[in-house]
């Protein structure tokens, strides 16, 4: 069975093809699909290609189906490694998760920042 694909366009114009079911993890995109207000391309105007690529990677990993079995322990380990990024990137991932309404990524980003603050690894400038 082939899955429906949609195209996402980042703020800097780069195009990404993603499975619709994976994209539905982004509540903003899911609402656009349900309201049929998408042509062939969904603009993601507040997210650069660099960050959108990471968001898609996260959504692909967290997309649950028979083809993607993953234990909770494996997923937690993957999440921890995924968030090993600089403050700038974490901040932009957090904003993208907020704009796209990806609750699990937003919670992960918030927890990462809280852990960094508690461990004195967050630079306040």
UniProtKB/Swiss-Prot annotation:
Protein name: SKP1-like protein 7
Tissue and organ expression note: Restricted to siliques.
One BP term from GO: response to jasmonic acid
This protein's GO CC annotations: nucleus; SCF ubiquitin ligase complex
Similarity comment: Belongs to the SKP1 family.
Chain's role: Involved in ubiquitination and subsequent proteasomal degradation of target proteins. Together with CUL1, RBX1 and a F-box protein, it forms a SCF E3 ubiquitin ligase complex. The functional specificity of this complex depends on the type of F-box protein. In the SCF complex, it serves as an adapter that links the F-box protein to CUL1.
InterPro entries, per the entry: SKP1, SKP1-like, SKP1-like_dim_sf, SKP1/BTB/POZ_sf, Skp1_comp_POZ
Naturally occurring in which organism (per UniProt): Arabidopsis thaliana (Mouse-ear cress)
Recorded metabolic or biological pathway in which this protein acts: Protein modification; protein ubiquitination
Name of encoding gene: ASK7
Localisation: Nucleus
Entry keywords, A to Z: Nucleus, Ubl conjugation pathway
Major site of localization recorded for this protein: nucleus
Assembly description: Part of a SCF (SKP1-cullin-F-box) protein ligase complex.
One matching Pfam family: Skp1_POZ
Record keyword rRNA-binding present: no
Interaction with the F-box domain of F-box proteins: region residues: 94-125
Coiled-coil stretches noted in the UniProt entry, renumbered to this chain: none
Record lineage: Eukaryota, Viridiplantae, Streptophyta, Embryophyta, Tracheophyta
């Amino acid at each position: 069975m082939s899955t429906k694909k949609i195209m996402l366009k980042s703020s800097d114009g780069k195009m990404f093809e993603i499975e619709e079911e994976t994209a539905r993890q982004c509540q903003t995109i899911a609402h656009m699909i349900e309201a049929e207000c998408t042509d062939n391309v969904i603009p993601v105007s507040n997210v650069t290609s660099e960050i959108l690529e990471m968001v898609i990677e996260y959504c692909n990993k967290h997309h649950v189906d028979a083809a993607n079995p993953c234990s909770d322990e494996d997923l937690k380990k993957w999440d921890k490694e995924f968030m090993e990024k600089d403050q700038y990137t974490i901040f932009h991932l957090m904003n993208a998760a907020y704009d796209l309404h990806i609750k699990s990524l937003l919670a992960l980003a918030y927890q990462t920042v809280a852990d960094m603050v508690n461990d004195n690894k967050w630079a306040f400038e």
